[in-house]
Swiss-Prot record:
Protein's recorded name: Peroxidase 49
UniProt GO molecular function: heme binding; lactoperoxidase activity; metal ion binding
PROSITE patterns: PEROXIDASE_1 (PS00435), PEROXIDASE_2 (PS00436), PEROXIDASE_4 (PS50873)
Secretion signal span: 1-22
Binding site for heme b: H197
Residue numbers binding Ca(2+) 2: T198, D249, S252, D257
Protein's GO biological process: hydrogen peroxide catabolic process; response to oxidative stress
Length: 331
């Protein structure tokens, strides 16, 4: 009997090991079942609100993905981007990368309101952003992934980090890669995550220099495919019209697929920060070619890189708080 008891104990320990490794692989205290008991319907609530928002406006999927990216690159994935200005907070919404372009905050508010009805004071705004990003991918035809949860919300924001950490449309390849490296992301993550530009739009002000004054000498970017450039000039005047939108992916702007990479190979990347992935570095060029040829490979890496990005410096344990309202810290 004693031998049987010992055997069963050993067997239980062996069976338990993979569970421990699984949780550990998601990054410390973050794990998918974090709300299994405290808010088991969290995934369904987030998905329902995001689905309605994307059904009303497909562009919202890209906007929500962008919010998650811009949040994680500043102080980690802590919901700091969602904070409005107050006596204690200089909002990141006023930074150059976010001013007049970051959107989707109302959708986050709707998700949070529904969660507060069902599970008050339980689900963080940082986790809301992470789940909404995943659902935005799925709802436009992109990959799904299991989202590690358990982030807490910051009590601060950083306008300066938002201005300095987030890659700009006119940055060089090396500058962009350096900004990714500082977040613990590598060149593969850079190329895969840039693939989210397969959906969404960009403002004229973000790519005008490529059309009229790429090098400061009054000449356009000659690497831009000429018929594509001519069409863009019809939409984007030399001056004015800063808020005019153009699609980031001219093949399938509303579908999450690998056509973004096919555009880069044809020199039809809208932003300079897109096109340099193909024109400025051999390793990134090979990754662009690989993802253009194999959508499954792109989807698999995108999901992996999104999980990795979502694990950037999360607040866990007793750090931070669970905001009641994503726009302001708890009083």
């Amino acid at each position: 009997m004693a031998r049987l008891t010992s055997f069963l104990l050993l067997l239980s320990l062996i069976c338990f090991v993979p569970l421990c490794l699984c949780d550990k692989s998601y990054g410390g205290k973050l794990f998918p079942g974090y709300y299994a008991h405290s808010c088991p319907q969290v995934n369904e609530i987030v998905r329902s609100v995001v689905a309605k928002a994307v059904a009303r406006e497909t562009r919202m999927a890209a906007s929500l993905l962008r919010l998650h990216f811009h949040d994680c690159f500043v102080q980690g994935c802590d919901g700091s981007l969602l904070l409005d200005s107050s006596g204690r907070v200089a909002t990141e919404k006023n930074s150059n990368p976010n001013s007049k372009s970051a959107r989707g905050f109302d959708v986050v508010d709707q998700i949070k309101a529904e969660l507060e009805k069902q599970c008050p004071g339980t689900v963080s705004c940082a986790d809301v952003l992470t789940l909404a990003a995943r659902d935005s991918s799925v709802l436009t035809g992109g990959p799904s992934w299991v989202v590690p949860l358990g982030r807490r919300d910051s009590r601060s924001a950083s306008l300066s980090q938002s201005n300095n950490n987030i890659p700009a449309p006119n940055n060089t390849f090396q500058t962009i890669l350096s900004k990714f490296n500082r977040q613990g992301l590598d060149i593969t993550d850079l190329v895969a995550l840039s693939g989210s530009h397969t959906i969404g739009f960009s403002r004229c002000t973000s790519f005008r220099q490529r059309l009229y004054n790429q090098s400061g000498n009054g000449s356009p970017d000659m690497t831009l495919e000429q018929s594509f450039a001519a069409n863009l000039r019809q939409r984007c005047p030399k001056s004015g019209g800063d808020q005019i939108l153009s699609v980031l992916d001219i093949i399938s702007a509303a579908s999450f697929d690998n056509s973004y990479f096919k555009n880069l190979i044809e020199n039809k990347g809208l932003l300079n920060s897109d096109q340099v992935l193909f024109s400025s570095n051999e390793k990134s060029r090979e990754l662009v070619k690989k993802y253009a040829e194999d959508q499954g490979e792109f989807f698999e890496q995108f999901a992996e890189s999104m999980i990795k990005m979502g694990n950037i410096s999360p607040l866990t344990g007793s750090s931070g708080e669970i905001r009641k309202n994503c726009r302001k810290i708890n009083s």
